[in-house]
Amino acid sequence: MTEHEKKPPTSPWTIRSTTKRDRSIVASLLSHAPHRHIHLDWYTTYDFLDESPSLIAFDDQRDIALLACPPDTAGIGWIRHFAVSEGVPTAALWELLWKQALSIAPSVGITTVSALITQSWFIPLLQGQGFSQSTEVIFLEWKGREVQVDLPLHATLRTMTSHDLDAVANVDKRAFQPLWQHSIRALDAAFEISAFATVVEVDEKVVAYQMSTSSALGAHLARLAVEPKMQSQGIAKALVTHALRYFHGRGIERMSVNTQADNKRSQVLY
């Protein structure tokens, strides 16, 4: 047993940290596990395999469970994935992996761990370890209605480039509470897969941005942020309506967005 492996007392399973070499193991477990949670964002499930905590449990014969919740922004770890193979106890492995992740968390600066739930089976496992619900994420959809773009006279809207990412990350950090902020690494990943991304400038300084993706199902407004001091001036509305017109002009008649149930300002905007 190596220094990276740990077998808890009385447990039939061994835990170790993952590495990039575990890509095929992770892919197989996530593909076949009857219970699996995968965080919804712009990263792949393999992007954090060399980071901590990212754990795998195994017995003498096979790899049986995964848990990853490494930080991406300061102090915040989202549960990136959790999966358990068929025929092994989900609750017991969750508790085992979670306790190991929790013991690692302080060493990597994690003070808060969150989970974006998409399946109800995971809720009692989280609650059993002290998680509590803080908000809900809701889904809104636009279906092809013509819109008017009204940009404030003092602002300029243009296509985003990779050179804007530092400024975009600064806007994002100031616009959101820590739990909902994204790192420049995450924003770069979002930019790479975006179908349409724009920024708004005032006095040649980026004060707002949006990034949207598209698929056979339609477009999706993946991220939008406005400098707090520039909010309530119509800038966010201009970014949204400009994106709607862009996709409408390309024959895309549906666009979706997710937002928090307690974020009334964004709901009014959308």
Residue ranges and their predicted role:
Residues 41-99, 103, 202, 207-222, ...:
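Conserved donor-binding loop and adjoining core beta-sheet/short helix segment
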Residues 17, 28-41, 170-182:
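Helix-loop element at the rim of GNAT/NAT acetyltransferase active sites that forms part
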Residues 1-7, 73, 85-153:
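Acyl-donor-binding surface of acyltransferase catalytic domains
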Residues 113-116, 221, 255-259:
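Conserved hydrophobic beta-strand within the GNAT/NAT acetyltransferase core sheet
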Residues 138-161, 253, 258-264:
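C-terminal "cap" of GNAT-fold acetyltransferases
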Residues 7-26, 156-168:
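A short beta-loop-alpha structural element at the N-terminal edge
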Residues 90-103, 226, 232-245, 249, ...:
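Conserved acetyl-CoA-binding loop-helix of GNAT-fold acetyltransferases
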Residues 180-182, 189-202, 206-215:
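Phosphate-binding active sites in nucleotide-utilizing proteins
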